[in-house]
Amino acid sequence: MICRMLLQLSEMPARALLAGRLAAVLFSLATITTAVPAFGQAGGAGLGAQAVGGISIDADGIIQNLDPRAIEQLANQRRELLAGKPLGAAGRRELQKVSLRRIIAAVEAAVAKGSQVPTDVLTLGGLERVEYVFVDRDARDLVLAGPGDAAVIDATGNLVAAGSGRPLLLLEDLIVALRAIDAARMGGMRCSIDPSPEGIAQLQAFLGNVRSLADSQAIFRQMEEALGPQQITVGGVPADSHFAQVLVAADYRMKRIGMGLEPSGLQGLPSYLSMVPAGGGSMLPRFWLEARYDPIARDPDELAWKLSGRKLVCLTESDLLAREGLQRGRGRSDAMAKRWCELMTKHYNDLAARQPVFAELANCVDLAVVAALIDSRQLADQAGLDLSPLLDEANLALPVYGVPRQVPTVASGIKKGSRWVLSASGGVQFQPWAFVETTIEAADVGKQRTLALASRPEAGFSWE
């Protein structure tokens, strides 16, 4: 997430600095380091080395932007790998149904043979999102349903729906969510980027000695050196998973947009930095991305569930503090930070259409909520479905990705009157368990289940 902070050089308490993670970042996300047969060469639907969100991670866990030529080469390699393979649904489907029992059978067969799971299985039959979860007691199955499509490789190497261009759901993200959901009861699923305490102290000391603002670039460079690399923290999911890569990459891309390091591509979403007025105050805004849902609808027998109203919202640090009952920050910069968050929230879906990593984040949130629903309502037990083949880490190893650990600090900002506007950090966080606490009864959800189960084919793991 992006954060920029307005700070007056004479006014920088350590706590304020910590709350609004200083200095802008330039990242480069890494490649996957370990491959497992069932999930292909390094996972990601069997597509080889990953570059989630256009970033890469080196052997030391340091993030950087991926070279555009490397992205183009990766896209071409993926097209070659997928040539002639089944990719998602056979054309656009408004309500694609996917059998988890048959998905599990396909995975077990691949593990037994030491072969790769078919790409259409790894992409959950081309699902773009999950709208329904159905319990099928007769077939001892759980059925996921939502819009589906055939898959194509886009210009940046992402596996996306042919019609909408949205990234497809990935089986490996669902497995990570199912495995991690119990531990996520405390703290949710999240990532953040923080300066070290030592770096904050060093930056404080440096700013306390600044007497002249004449050479801004020199000051920025010294700030970078004083603060040092920022630390990446991932919680609630394994840091070496694709799921974690998505959290970090979305956070990073949002920061770059807010900092003005790359355009959003949307007229209605300028950088936060460009919006801050002169003399805006000394508050240090920090931005977070969170998820919201409408109450989950269910039938009276709790055999059919409908997810709706999912959206990602941008919040300032003071919004989060207010929610916790703590004092909010004050000042004009807080109002501008809030306004930028409102614009980010308003244009999130449009941004996701331009930068797929934001759609991937929404996909991961959906799958985490599905995992929480299955666990909290014991849906697998109700169906008589054994999920252990997916949950058994010893028998089904997932791809291992480079663990993002640090971001080189790049101080970037502008002078506003006698004050500096600098970049700061934030994070991505959501609590999937919160979304399954409140449900509403809706008769039409049960009708959808009846139609879906009646059309189940004798063979195949997905159907319309």
What residue spans do the PLM features occupy?
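Bacterial N-terminal signal peptides
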Residues: A19-T34
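Serine/proline-rich low-complexity intrinsically disordered segments, especially terminal tails, linkers
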Residues: M5, M12, A30-V36
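Outer membrane pore-forming secretion/assembly proteins and partners of Gram-negative envelopes
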Residues: F39-E464
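N-terminal secretory signal peptides that target proteins for export/translocation
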Residues: M1-A19
